[in-house]
Amino acid sequence: MRKIYLVSNTKTADESVVNLSVSSIEFLKFEINLSEFDALVTTSKNAFKALKFNGILPINLPVFAIANSCAAAAREFGFSKIYTGQNAHGDDFAREILPLLKGKKVLYLKGKDSASNFLEILQKGGVNIKAVVAYENVLNPCKMELKPPKNSILIFASPINVRNFLSNFGWDESYQTISIGKVTAKELKFSTPLVSQSQDINACIALAKTLL
């Protein structure tokens, strides 16, 4: 029977899916005074882990989070004023919150290799935004025996996971791919990925199971 592999930094508890970690997150040192800003925007739950890593405590600051998992991480960290985006694609989320950020001084905690045009859209829209690189995805070297066998179904959760999978294992034309979103799908242009309707790991897994 074909196997489903989740290529992601986020693991699933679903025992029918193999977790494959080809990337790891490194948090970067920075200093920031949250009280200098009117809002915090985040496109990953790693933003809150980066705040914790740097010993920065939550304050009564509105947070604009890209999706439910990101909003949950904000709440768990200690923020209470949280706007959860209706759009889980970076570019669409930027356009959604742009009118809400006009006239505000905004902080954006981002990854080193952000795949979307999120920051550029807000900047061109006239938002006063300060971007801080708070974390980065680095290659997690894997042994070749971990390479998925032929005809496996691979779920990719980000563009960097595609690149790091290729660095570790190369590619097999028999693989079937599922992408969590549009930007990741572009990175999979050498295959024909199915794009999940919902930018959520569980939704991707449900889609993968329809292919078994």
Where are these regions (language model features)?
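Signature of uroporphyrinogen-III synthase
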Residues: 1-212
